[in-house]
Every structure is written in structure tokens, then in C-alpha cells.
């Protein structure tokens, strides 16, 4: 029997993991084993919110070395991370400045400035990317305005996954799916947009032309001396997660649920019309030339911060207590910029409820209930927006990623959206990473072929909508109120 051993390095905003995948060609089975899991998080350094890329690199190398120490022959390695953030290098490949995180406040006020100076519609027509205040476009503008002394030293700007691939191989690459998240790639040419780059203040020479997933960047020399190919996978973690979403037919939507929730659908063509612009829809690059038409939702970041501030260690117990509470007593907009990185998330949630004359969530369970209900309602709104955009309703929603283990939120989502929810796989980004590696090794034909493997090997759970649930009645009441207002307008 023929085996392939592929390693996925999957870095998220709150944790990272090195995973070993074993693929059996004859029976088309795929098994995952966690080799090394480690924490990731924000740090304060010289007045900036930053990432500790040295610690992350050490953890990656530790995980890879563990695989080699077991005597396993690695066939390939792939790295995926979050989007928009970058590392600057000089001509010798040494870092310039700090690896600033997207939650830093340095970009405050720059997005409206860009819209005024370049035109909101023009930016959107060029990039097809949603307006988020921390997009790379605004981060680079902040850098060039606030730290001009760094500019003469910069020779290269590498996005996070490309930086770690460079550290392993010594070769530079600019992978397409992640590059599109910057709001700097022209949606028609798939290359860096010169007008947007000019506004950012960055030099085009800092970047190489984006390359699509599936090429070998270079090789990592393992401790035993073997050269192991490092593959340019779909290096934006959501792009990898979508590859591993077992989407079945054109009426399937996906929700990649983690620190961020990203809801969308696959399309062969982008959506950049007025409706898409008004809804702030993004058209991020995917594998095989597909577009990930989606919308960012703040996601479980709010819960992560509450758990941290309240020092809650038993999440299952919290969810059980939350489930016993009535629904929809405390509703916030999770996508409000006030929740990007407040000093105290609990206080910020309570303030938002107070300002809208709602009861104030005080207990741990009440805060969690507020977050879960608010997310489910926002999921329903976004799914409706996406259906209107493409002119066709969805028949099912695939929730993938770590957040799909939250059965309460899955059921709330099914009830609020009125749609069948299929939860799983949990390690979607890792699996999608592995999928591209296997295609590069000529073990699989394409993304659809890989999804068949996922469908037969992953643990999937179905949640059926309950029209009699509290949140379903709440949604129906909102829709009725909206229709009445429209008739009376």
C-alpha cells in the first residue's frame, strides 16, 4: 500500500499547530495526527501590538523536528496563516521594524482617507476586496507615514505564510490567495495594482508577482539531511478551510468559524456590483481560479476575550449554563469596530447593551449568551445578503474550523438562518493545506476530488433548523417588523 506523509503548519491568531497527514492512495483515506500545538497571541512592543514571529518560527521548527525524530519520511510541507499582516526584510533578508498585528490602532482613520482620495467605488472595482480598517493597504500607508525612517532599509515585504516559508527555504514567494486579502491585488490582472500601491506608499519592488497555489517554493533541509519540498498551499487559512469544506452543489454556503467567522460561497466570477459594494462583500482568491465571495464577521474573538478576562477554563460548563438561559435578551453587533481590540471586552459588550437600552449581561453565561445569539443573528443577516447578491437561496450551510465544535452555536445558527447546517471538519484549514500538497504530489486531481476524500473521512454532524425555537421566533418577528416598515415607507 502506498502512503504519503504531508505536514501542515497551520497558524491562527490564537494558536498554531503542526499536523501530520497520512494519505493511503489505494483506499483514498486521510488521517491526521497532531504533532505540536502552541499558543499564539498579541504582544505589546515599543507602543505597537505585534506578533512574536521568532517564537512562532521556533515552534514550527520544533514540530517539524519531532516528525523527523520519529523516522517518518516527509513528502511535503505547507504553511497557512491569517491574512493581511506582513514582515519587512532588508537586502540581506534581515527584519526591518516590527511585525505589527492587524489589531494595532496605527491604521485608525486611514480607510476613510483612502476612500475620499481614491474613491470608494474605484478601490472596490480594482481590488474586489471588502473595506476593513486593518487591510494591508492601510497598514502600509500607516508604516510609510509614521515610520519613514524605515523605508530606505526595506527591500522585501512578505505576508506571514510567505515569511515562514522563506525562513525554512531561503526562497521568497507571494502566494495569491493570501495576497488578495491585502486589498492591493488587481482583480482583473491578479497582480499588484500600481495605483493602490502608490497610495499605500509602498514600493512595487518589495513584492514579487503573486503565484497560485500548487508550486514548490523551495526545500527545507531536515536534521537528517533530506531535502523536503515546501509547497505554496492556499496560504490564507480561510482559503485552505474552504478547500476542505465538503460543499455539495451550487446551493451550499460555508462558514469558517474561529477567531473570525467568514461566511460565503464559491464562484467562478467575482461580484463587484453596487449591491456587493453596499454589503461590503469581499472577493478573495481561492484555489483553481475560484473566488471566495464572503463577508468577515468578528467571530469567536469576543468569546476568547471574555474567557481570558473572566479566567474561565471550563468552556463546556459555560456553554451548558448558557444553553439554560432564554435567548435574545442581549443583542449586540459583533462587527462593530469597538470590538476589534477593546481594553476590556466584557465592559465593551455591557456598554453596547446599555447604550441600546437593553438588560446588561453580568454573569459569565449571560455574556456568552449575548455573544452566541448575536453571532447567530448576524449569520442569518449575512446569509440573506449573500443569497440576494447571487439571486438564489442556499440549501445548506457548512460550518468548518474549531468553532464548529460549539454545538449550541451550530443549532442557533441553523434556527436563525432556517437552514440545514453540516458541522465539520474541525481542522479544515489543516486539511485544505494538505489537499493542495497532495495535488502538488499528483495524488489527487483537483479540489472537488479532494472534497470527496474529506466527505468520506471527516466526522460531520447535521443540525436541523427548529422553527419553534426562541431565536427562530425572534428572527420571524424582526422580518415582520421590517416588512411593515417597508410597506409604510
Swiss-Prot record:
Protein keywords: ATP-binding, Disulfide bond, Kinase, Magnesium, Nucleotide-binding, Rhamnose metabolism, Transferase
Disulfide-bond pairs as recorded: 68-222, 353-370, 413-417
Residue sites binding ATP per the record: 13-17, 259, 304, 402
Annotated metabolic or biological route of this protein: Carbohydrate degradation; L-rhamnose degradation; glycerone phosphate from L-rhamnose: step 2/3
Molecular function via GO: ATP binding; glycerol kinase activity; rhamnulokinase activity
Binding site for substrate: 83, 236-238, 296
Active site positions: 237 (proton acceptor)
One GO CC term, this protein: cytosol
Catalytic activity: L-rhamnulose + ATP = L-rhamnulose 1-phosphate + ADP + H(+)
Pfam families documented for this protein: FGGY_C (PF02782), FGGY_N (PF00370)
Domain of life: Bacteria
One annotated GO biological process: rhamnose catabolic process
Cofactor(s) needed by this chain: Mg(2+)
EC number: 2.7.1.5
HAMAP family tied to this protein: Rhamnulokinase
Function: Involved in the catabolism of L-rhamnose (6-deoxy-L-mannose). Catalyzes the transfer of the gamma-phosphate group from ATP to the 1-hydroxyl group of L-rhamnulose to yield L-rhamnulose 1-phosphate.
UniProt record similarity statement: Belongs to the rhamnulokinase family.
Descriptive protein name: Rhamnulokinase
Organism whose genome encodes this protein: Shigella flexneri
